[in-house]
């Protein structure tokens, strides 16, 4: 009395999950490649005195997320700006950049190509910690596929003192 899930790989169907608990209605299939489509089939079963009875299969195609952005770093930090750098995601159309401010994540930029791998956030306050996150996206036949977000933290530097401030200390 449960469910069996099969994944089509290597030219054949392989059982990847089985439960005898009919209240379990989801599972996670691991070791899949990013930005790939897979065929799955699911069927219910019931154990009887005469053996196991199976329902018909329900088939579905699933698409995995894009690979996460790799190598995200906050570099070129100044008193009022942070430069974000990351590695190219070969499958991406572009990248979405967000900043955490006011208690929520706010989109601050979207790149429209896969070759822009830096973004400088300007107009920041001195000596202040900030959080940024980046995810890749891919436009694919009218649908958009996303990676998960990757987060980086950085603190802006203390600005320079005005020259009259330094001379007033003497």
Model-derived regions: residue spans:
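Ser/Thr- and Asn-enriched, surface-exposed coil loops between beta-strands
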Residues: 21-26, 76-83, 113-118
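Tandem-repeat/low-complexity and Cys-motif detector
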Residues: 18-19, 28-31, 47-49, 64, ...
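Beta-strand-rich modules
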Residues: 29-48, 121-141
């Amino acid at each position: 009395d449960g469910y069996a899930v099969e994944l089509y790989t290597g030219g054949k169907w392989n059982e990847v999950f089985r439960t005898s608990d009919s209240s379990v209605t989801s599972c996670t299939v691991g070791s899949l490649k990013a930005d790939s489509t897979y065929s799955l089939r699911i069927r219910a079963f019931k154990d009887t005195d005469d053996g196991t009875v199976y329902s018909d299969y329900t088939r579905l195609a699933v698409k995995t997320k894009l690979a996460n952005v790799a190598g995200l770093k906050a570099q070129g930090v100044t008193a009022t700006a942070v430069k974000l750098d990351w590695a190219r995601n070969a499958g991406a159309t572009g990248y979405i950049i967000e900043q955490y401010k006011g208690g929520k994540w706010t989109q601050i930029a979207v790149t429209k190509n896969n070759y822009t791998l830096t973004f400088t956030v300007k107009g920041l306050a001195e000596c202040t910690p900030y959080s940024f996150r980046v995810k890749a996206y891919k436009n694919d036949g009218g649908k958009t596929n996303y990676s998960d977000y990757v987060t980086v933290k950085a603190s802006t530097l203390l600005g320079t003192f005005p020259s009259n401030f330094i001379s007033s200390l003497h």
